[in-house]
Regions:
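Phosphate-group recognition and catalysis centered on beta-loop-alpha active-site segments
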Residues: 2-295
Length: 295
């Protein structure tokens, strides 16, 4: 996830209309599909003052390079309920875990990730930028992540980077089904088209929209696009503090990203959000334990 304001056309009226139509057609053509609700994924929706669930942003990047197997393993082995990661794809269509559009920040490569084959990506060093301890760490594939995730009892927030057609996304849903974890993953995206593709291919896997701006009618938006909730910035909820309660009344979940300080954690808890995505998951988990009522 990023707070950069890119993909300005992602929420254009035309794209939104097409995605909404796709969701409606999905419901018409698949009447037997079992609905998925926020409570199925997040448990009881929170009240103001309740502890949110904690999701490690790109794994536990406080102790290992983001979106690498060591960072993800740290999150899986921690007390956290959720791990969050990003899914991109190589030029030959293999799903890999990577956040940025380009390789420079977190590898010794340059240029767009999408321009490289998996074999080329696997030659890159994705660890030494973080620490010499992780020199030689490779960009993992989704399949490699699912292999360490499947034996756990965790849940995964899988952010689809950019636009995925149904054809592009088919390998992702196949890998999830093969790993037997379809009941423990949630698709997220800024891109409504990708969420529409996910709904068409795997309607039983819940979906969450990531929003940089909040529409006036957030509940209507969620209903239109068949999502169980939204992920947004806490500053947007600060301006509309009643919104969290309204969404919970409507059966929708609310998560915030990416909060890394005690002040922002306290504000999110006071609002009653269901989940906090953070770069400091162990610290947040400890803070929640230390500040729980009665401690």
């Amino acid at each position: 996830m990023t707070t950069a304001h890119t993909h300005k056309g992602a929420y254009s009226l035309g794209a939104s209309f097409c995605a909404a139509v796709a969701i409606i057609l999905l419901l018409v053509l698949n009447p037997g599909t079992t609905p998925v609700y926020a409570t199925d994924v997040f448990g009881d929706l929170r009240q103001p003052g309740d502890a949110s669930f904690v999701a490690g942003h790109r794994g536990d990047r406080s102790g290992a390079p983001e979106n690498t197997l060591p960072a993800l393993q740290r999150a899986i082995e921690s007390p956290l309920e959720f791990v969050e990661t990003d899914i991109a794809r190589s030029s030959d269509g293999v799903p890999v875990l990577f956040h940025d559009r380009t390789l420079k920040r977190t590898t010794n490569g340059v240029g767009p990730l999408a321009a490289r084959t998996l074999a080329e990506l696997k030659t890159l060093d994705a660890g030494s930028w973080y620490s010499s301890e992780f020199t030689g760490e490779r960009i993992p594939t989704l399949e490699e992540f699912l292999a360490i995730f499947a034996p756990s009892e965790k849940k995964a927030l899988l952010e689809l980077k950019g636009y995925w057609t149904p054809e592009d996304l088919a390998i992702v849903t196949e890998l999830i089904e093969k790993a037997g974890v379809a009941d423990r993953v949630i698709f997220m995206s800024f891109n409504l088209g990708s969420l529409s593709s996910a709904a068409a291919l795997a309607p039983g896997i819940p979906r969450v929209a990531i929003l940089r701006t909040l529409p006036e009618d957030v509940i209507g938006f969620a209903r239109s696009f068949g999502v169980i909730g939204v992920v947004t910035e806490s500053r947007l909820l600060r301006d509309r503090p009643e919104l969290v309660d309204d969404m919970h009344t409507a059966g929708l979940g609310v998560m915030v990203y990416t909060l890394n300080s005690v002040e922002t954690w306290a504000e999110a808890r006071a609002l009653g959000v269901d989940g906090i995505i953070t770069d400091r998951p162990s610290h947040l988990d400890q803070w929640l334990a230390e500040t729980a009522p009665g401690t």
